[in-house]
Amino acid sequence: MADTTPNGPQGAGAVQFMMTNKLDTAMWLSRLFTVYCSALFVLPLLGLHEAASFYQRALLANALTSALRLHQRLPHFQLSRAFLAQALLEDSCHYLLYSLIFVNSYPVTMSIFPVLLFSLLHAATYTKKVLDARGSNSLPLLRSVLDKLSANQQNILKFIACNEIFLMPATVFMLFSGQGSLLQPFIYYRFLTLRYSSRRNPYCRTLFNELRIVVEHIIMKPACPLFVRRLCLQSIAFISRLAPTVP
């Protein structure tokens, strides 16, 4: 009896915290489900046919999470242009659109990584809050894993941004290979411009600039053929014209 009494208040504290923050708890559960489905798609332990269904479930769960988060950020829905403009500034709206773009498309492993990693990062943050409510010294091994995940957050966000960027040519390739729709590259381009302009997550914009600097450094070397240099410079100029203006 003496061993079990301390666990009661700890567990009650965690449950009370989750009940007090019901919307955050609902998003936490949907993110954990997204991570679960994404993992079973990336690692098809139950077979390739089941993996495709887990791909769709992961995107649907992410759409639910994004919708809940958007409601949390903008609780008072209005059918107006001003509300839509405000919604398009939110990262949750971006990934609601992202989920809808890919949910009925041919399964692409690259497209599931942003969903998986964002869900993992946000779920880890809330899990730490639940553990804190349970007790400052509860489950030290899990806390250690969560701390390591947080320590690598910047690298993970850069990897997500890299996926977001290279999915643009991937959607074009899918179109010409017969695995994508005609509208998908255009809608995804709109998503990418929203990510480029994101106020809360500048990693997509930063990575674009870093890639441009790296390419320019390589093509300016004397060993680079002239036609390759011209092609790259024209491509950089074209992409720069497509980039939205960021205030």
From Swiss-Prot:
Residues 2-31, 122-155 are lumenal. One of its GO terms (biological process) is positive regulation of IRE1-mediated unfolded protein response. Prostate cancer and several cancer cell lines (at protein level). Widely expressed. Expressed at higher levels in endocrine-resistant breast cancer cells as compared to endocrine-sensitive breast cancer cells. Expressed at higher levels in early recurrence breast cancer tissues as compared to non-recurrent breast tumors. The modification N-acetylalanine is found at A2. Residues 53-100, 177-247 are cytoplasmic. The chain crosses the membrane at residues 32-52, 101-121, 156-176. It holds the Pfam family TMEM33_Pom33. One of its GO terms (cellular component) is endoplasmic reticulum. Keywords: Acetylation, Endoplasmic reticulum, Immunity, Innate immunity, Membrane, Nucleus, Transmembrane, Transmembrane helix. Induction: By endoplasmic reticulum (ER) stress. It comes from the Eukaryota. Its main location: endoplasmic reticulum. It is a multi-pass membrane protein. It is found in: Endoplasmic reticulum membrane; Melanosome; Nucleus envelope. Disulfide bonds: none annotated. Acts as a regulator of the tubular endoplasmic reticulum (ER) network by modulating intracellular calcium homeostasis. Mechanistically, stimulates PKD2 calcium-dependent activity. Suppresses the RTN3/4-induced formation of the ER tubules. Positively regulates PERK-mediated and IRE1-mediated unfolded protein response signaling. Plays an essential role in VEGF-mediated release of Ca(2+) from ER stores during angiogenesis. Also plays a role in the modulation of innate immune signaling through the cGAS-STING pathway by interacting with RNF26. Belongs to the PER33/POM33 family. Interacts with EIF2AK3. Interacts with ARL6IP1, isoform RTN1-A of RTN1, isoform RTN2-B of RTN2, isoform 3 of RTN3 and isoform 3 of RTN4. Interacts with RNF5. Interacts with RNF26. Interacts with PKD2. This is Transmembrane protein 33.
